[in-house]
A protein has these predicted regions:
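Key residue(s) within conserved catalytic/signature motifs
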Residues: 1, 43, 47-48, 78-84, ...
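Catalytic NTP-binding/metal-coordinating core of nucleotidyl cyclase/transferase enzymes
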Residues: 1-71
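Intrinsically disordered or compositionally simple regulatory linkers and C-terminal tails
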Residues: 1-5, 152-177
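Catalytic beta-strand-to-alpha-helix segment of the class III nucleotidyl cyclase homology domain
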Residues: 39-42, 63-157
Length: 177
């Protein structure tokens, strides 16, 4: 595991848990909540000195980049602590876009997953009350090595007992190794 250099970009990617179902069952509620959601995301990303990607993949998902990993982790925590109903964010934080996307995709709504590389650079500078919980090792992509997988914890956040959203092949590899 290598430490993230101070000048390396840290990615924060988020998606909404069950987005398609929510849009199908309550499109008016989702549309009404979307302006507040977007304003809140924009506020917390800017507060941390981050930049939102101009090309958003989904209207209720986003990508942001930060110069400092601590700012990305703080932004993720603030977003998870803020009521954003009906949006429940699945957040990934890492130093490469593909790895961040993978973390985002295996997280549950209300959960933030952080790579070991990023965690090692923020461990001494977490937001007040925040801790990191080791969840095992995870391959971050076909070309990236395995990383320690950490969950951002805080007394104001839910505790997760469910397994992560992983394809069976990935889950089997983690259980065997």
């Amino acid at each position: 595991m290598t430490e993230v250099p101070a000048n390396e970009t840290t990615w924060l990617m988020a998606r909404t848990e069950g987005s398609a179902r929510l849009w199908q069952t309550d499109s008016r509620g989702m549309a009404a909540a979307l302006p507040y959601f977007r304003a809140t995301v924009t506020h917390f990303v800017a507060l941390g000195g981050g930049t939102l990607s101009p090309s958003q993949g989904a209207c209720d998902g986003f990508t942001a980049v930060f110069d400092r990993a601590t700012d990305a982790v703080s932004c993720a925590l603030y977003l998870q602590l803020t009521p954003l109903d009906p949006f429940e964010l699945c957040i990934g934080v890492h130093s490469s876009a593909p790895g961040t996307e993978r973390l985002r995709d295996i997280a549950h709504g209300g959960q933030t997953l952080i790579s070991g590389t990023t965690a090692s650079s923020v461990a001494g500078d977490l937001p007040s009350g925040a801790t990191l919980k080791y969840l095992g090792d995870q391959r971050m992509g076909d070309t990236e090595p395995s990383e320690r997988l950490m969950q951002l914890c805080h007394p104001g956040l839910r505790r997760y007992l469910r397994p992560l959203h992983m394809p069976n092949a990935v889950l089997a590899e983690i259980l065997v190794n």
